[in-house]
Amino acid sequence: MALGSELDLTELNEKVLADGKKLVLPVVFGKDLIFREVKGLTEEYFAIGSFGIREPKEDLPLWDPKEERSNTLWLLPGVAFDRGCRRLGQGGGYYDRTLERLRAFQRAGDTIAGVAFSCQIADRIPTEEWDASLDKVISPGEIYINQHI
């Protein structure tokens, strides 16, 4: 679910569900993110979690990135991105740690992409050595592809 100025993916999530695809959404769990599968976007599937964010309820099935799957698209929010597919988050490191885990189980056909408004994309953003790069950054006007992965 979108936080602050992040791009709201509700319409896309509705389309994913309407197409019969699996939709998993993040839940803050300690210093990490875990993912739970949702079958709808109504209140019956959500509770207010950490940081006041709507998160999937804890009785929903956990998603394991090791499970058998194909052509998975992970869409990540951010405060800012750059054309080199680097991401600036909220500062907690949740998605950096999650990306490290996801990369360990990434298969051919999987894509890890940031989603942003065009105004959130810069030529270059400051990053640290632990900041993970994405495969792509998608905005309403353009798609940037990481040439170094």
Segments the model singles out, each with a brief description of its role:
Residues 1-69:
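N-terminal active-site beta-alpha-beta segment that forms phosphate/nucleotide-binding
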Residues 2-5, 79-83:
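Short glycine-rich anion-binding loops that position phosphate/pyrophosphate groups of nucleotides
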Residues 16-19, 34-36, 94-98, 117-121:
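Short amphipathic alpha-helical surface micro-motifs
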Residues 50, 74-81:
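Short secondary-structure transition/capping segments
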Residues 57-74, 83-87, 96-149:
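Surface-exposed, charge/polar-rich loops and edge strands
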